[in-house]
């Protein structure tokens, strides 16, 4: 499926079953995870550990109401951001805070 939150020329997609599994395990839907990409201070980093067949990345950014920092795993294909996983993880928050000092 394709979804969009207004990211320039990019749109989002994900596997619906993976989305449900992610929400059950981590309490975050992929729809919610899109908002991390709208954070002007977001941090994008390569996910070298999981980039065997295609490049994968992390996006560390604020959630919709700025109450937490999301870590979103994704890949990029033909102007589409395919979300693979998302959640609130301490390591992602630490990377975000180191890149955006107060």
Task: For every predicted segment, state its role.
Residues 1-102:
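Ribonuclease/tRNase effector modules and their secretory precursors
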